[in-house]
């Protein structure tokens, strides 16, 4: 597990719409999709972990009391991010594998960073090299590593 912090300042944008992707606050009607995305995206991102016992309902516990942003493209939900705002902590950021590397994660991260009142933080599994590279490309740096 590594801890990362953002050093990159973000630019205010008047609209969170780019390349037909809109970032909006979550709605209860998003829950079924986000549960499914959370389950399947974790299994794909962390194949070395035993995801057999993970359940759709894990999303509910993992995002309890967090601010959730949903990425929507042409009416289809394609990703989400959740933040524990008290600590400026990015807890989850997952994009449907079909929409990865298309800028969706960038837009979600940009929105999350706009909500931070100070330096943001996150944890990322050390073996999740793709995610680490993503955050580093966006100005985050590793503060510490551990189990």
Model segments located where?
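Active-site acidic-Proline motif in GNAT/NAT acetyltransferases
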Residues: 96-102, 126-127
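Acetyl-CoA-dependent GNAT
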Residues: 16, 25-98, 109-111, 115
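Conserved N-terminal entry element of GNAT/NAT acetyltransferase domains
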Residues: 1-29
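Conserved GNAT acetyl-CoA-binding A-motif
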Residues: 115-127
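Conserved acetyl-CoA-binding loop of GNAT-fold acetyltransferases
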Residues: 136-145
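Conserved acetyl-CoA-binding loop-helix of GNAT-fold acetyltransferases
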Residues: 101-114, 133, 137
